[in-house]
Amino acid sequence: RPMTGTGMGYLNANPNEYHITMDYHLDDMKEAFYSLVKMSDGLTECYRPGTFDRWKQSFRYLQEMNPRFIYVWGGGFGYGPKCFGGSYDILGQAHAGLASVTGFHDYVGGHATKHSNWCIDWYSGTQITFGILAAIHWRRKTGLGTMIEFSQVQAATRCLGYAAPLYGRFGIVRQRWGNWDTQLCAHGIILCGKSDFPDAKNPQDRLEARYAMISAFQDEDWKELCAITGMKDLYDKYKSHKERVEAEAQIEIYAALEKWAEDKSRSEVVKVCQDAGLLAEPVCNDREYYENEHWRTRGTVRWMDDPTFGDVLQHGSYSAGLLSKTPRRLFWIWRPVGADNVKIYHELLGYPTSKIEEWYDKAWI
């Protein structure tokens, strides 16, 4: 709820959604739940396995009420020996292998790292949505709904790229490689010596605006990079991509690039590279992203007048891309829990307001 405890992390997580409260254990609430099921396309739940079945609202019960119903269990580990394990984003990143390949190699003092964002929560939602679209396609052909079983933890393995095939084929466990690329070189992020905003009050600007991305893995680009940075000895040593993509070579190459950049700002490094025809960009923070003319022109980051919270800077629904015929719509950034009880219970399901007031008095909603 605004000002009473709902965390800022909820912003942008559930735009355009109605929010109600419901106690499934009560008969009156169960009746309302079943009424929603009969008129809905489906639901997604992530309770421990068997919970909804005990409450007589699992797929086997709901499909009898609505044969077209699409039911998603977004379980933690999914069915199997650990099906009763809980589900948290950090658990998925850790247990499914993602954290082990995130961060710098221990050669430079790195360690396994959790992604700052809740990427597994977001990625799980994306994969579940894809499954729902497939279920809708199936329903159009057959007229029937289906149940989708999903493991949130295993969603992280889809972020690991070639890690599993690499181990299966060669027995090699993929390592952390930080801001470099295991398949391309030079193709990474380097630390520059000076900040673009040395006098800024915000430490994110003053201290962190020192990183630049440089890409020069093609032989001609690599030659040009070595020329403008004075690394002729490295060009002679690593003329072919096969030579410079090796781990030992990358360690030497990126150390030399950061040595070259130690008396330069991020902007200076990017300009030198871009003037030479190379791909280079600064690593931007949120403020710079917001101020970027490109994104503002596209309209993918914009201000909105949220009906509950007022002016909010957001990108939800607009950042998905530009659609040729379907307009992008964002009606609200989020809603307080229970904000739409009257709309759903009274306007949609037809319960009298006196009944809803009674539920409030009894603390049922």
Regions found by a protein language model. Name each.
Residues A112-Y123, M147, G178, C185-H187, ...:
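A short glycine-threonine-serine/GTX helix/turn-capping micro-motif
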Residues L98, S124-Q127, I148-T157, F217:
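NAD(P)-dependent dehydrogenases' Rossmann-like dinucleotide-binding region
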Residues R1-L144, P336, V342-I365:
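N-terminal helix-loop segment corresponding to the beta1-alpha1 unit
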Residues W180-C185, L191-D196, D205-R206, E288-I365:
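Terminal low-complexity tails and localization/encapsulation signals of metabolic enzymes
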Residues G76-Y79, Q152-R158, K194-D196, A216-D221, ...:
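Glycine-rich beta-alpha junction loops
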Residues R1, D89, L166-Q175, T229, ...:
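Short, surface-exposed loop/helix-turn segments at secondary-structure junctions
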Residues A186-A276, A280:
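Aromatic-enriched alpha-helical interface/lid elements that frame and gate functional surfaces
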Residues A135-N179, D286:
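Substrate-binding/catalytic subdomain of NAD(P)-dependent oxidoreductase enzymes
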